Every structure is written in C-alpha cells, then in structure tokens.
Amino acid sequence: VQNTTPKVALITAAALNGAIGIENRLPWQLPDDWAHFRRVTAGKPFVMGRKSALAEDALLSDTRNLILTRQAQPALPPGCEPVPSLEEAARRLAHEPEWFILGGAEVFAQALPIANYLYLTLVNGFFEADAFFPFHQLRWAEWELLHSVRREPDDRHRWAFAINEYQRRR
C-alpha cells in the first residue's frame, strides 16, 4: 500500500527568543541557511500569509504559491493564488506529495497541528522582533530530530546557527 499522506513541512529560521521577523523582514542574514532553504524547497509548492508574500526578501516557489488572506481581492505578486484558509490550501494541494508552509507567525500557529515535518534553523542569538515562532505550541515529545548541522560564525555568518530537520512521530 502506497502512503498517500503528503509531506507537509513548516520551514523557518528562529532565534533563541523565537524571533522570526521584524518589519516584515528577517532580522539576520545567513547565506548558507538561504542555500539550504532553496535546496529543500526547490520545485515544491508554498503556502504563506499575505504579509510574508509581500515581504522584500520573500522567496516564491517556481511551482505554486498559495497565499492565505482574508481580503477579497488582494494585491499579490504575479503567480500567487489567494486562498481564504489553511484548510482550503491543504485541499488544493492534496495531490502534491510535498508542500511547504513559510509563515508568518500566525500561519505557523495555525499550521503546527497539520504539519508532519519541521525544518527549523535555530539562530544562536536574541533579536528584536515583531513576529515570533509559536514555540509555546510545539510539543517536542511529538517530534523526532532526523538531522542537525551546526555552523559557527564565520566571515559570511555573524551568528552561530543549527539547521535541524524533524519528523512528527507516528
């Protein structure tokens, strides 16, 4: 019997204090984390909130971008499809073997219960932010760490960070 459950993955970078953004941009620059993001998400559909889609540093999928919005006729970047709810996005992507949820904070909070994978880059620092990952909702006992790569600061990365991949325990 073939497993037809899609891989629904949250992907984010968060600081030790949960910071994921300030004024609709990332609080840090981590080129190797961007490269990891592009590598694991290549060719996969994305789901994100409207503000994330409109961010200056937004990365859009070359496959499909579903944008969660309550607005009837939102101004969105080309190639983006508005959807009224996460449930509707999941319905539209039911045939996809894998798709990614990119945030922001409110979307992550809604999506945690349905996600079965988590790509979490943990940035070793505390940052001023106005958007935070909902760590308080994450039940760590439900997640198994599959892979972790730690990076120390260098000439391209001001902060240490760890790229972690988790799978929800069955």
What are the language-model segments listed below?
Residues V1-R170:
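Enzymes that bind and transform nitrogen-containing heteroaromatic metabolites
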